[in-house]
Amino acid sequence: MGAYKYMQELWRKKQSDVMRFLLRVRCWQYRQLSALHRAPRPTRPDKARRLGYKAKQGYVIYRIRVRRGGRKRPVPKGATYGKPVHHGVNQIKFARSLQSVAEERAGRHCGGLRVLSSYWVGEDSTYKFFEVVLVDTFHKAIRRNPDTQWITKAVHKHREMRGLTSAGKKSRGLGKGHKFHLTIGGSRRAAWKRRNTLQLHRYR
């Protein structure tokens, strides 16, 4: 086994004495820092590399702190208006994961960079911490490399806002197999539209 494989196994055994101590110390360290800050290097180099990170110019790591728990509906004094079924304010569950929220915040803060992917690095009772891999698409090391040229195209601007990253796709119900029949055709809306549209072909 290579070094990265050993590292991967370490992260899979989070309840081991070493990892429990490490995660506890790191969570304390991350809490002292701002909610969004640049990390000098990835905390999990094995995971970052599997997601496409390379230790060369053009790649940036940002660490994001996201508050855990449900989402409160942002309405003044609980005045939601409308029918009683939509009066809920407190017990609202957000449709997307906290990881995709972290990616979105990193993408907003670094508008000139592209979000490649992200991964979990720690959590406590109040916060979850994620590291987001961003790419500078104007750097020659990225533009001249055939493996990374795809992300320089304009169609990939703010992928994280449109649910195109790995974390964003999870809440869209996309995938293969019998569990993902609701999104056959690209999305929930596309599947619903096709199933609820009456097609009267000329030759039928």
From Swiss-Prot:
GO terms for biological process: cytoplasmic translation. The keyword Cytoplasm applies. Its main location: cytoplasm. Gene3D superfamilies: Ribosomal protein l15e. The keyword Lipid biosynthesis does not apply. This is Large ribosomal subunit protein eL15. The gene is rpl15. GO terms for cellular component: cytosolic large ribosomal subunit.
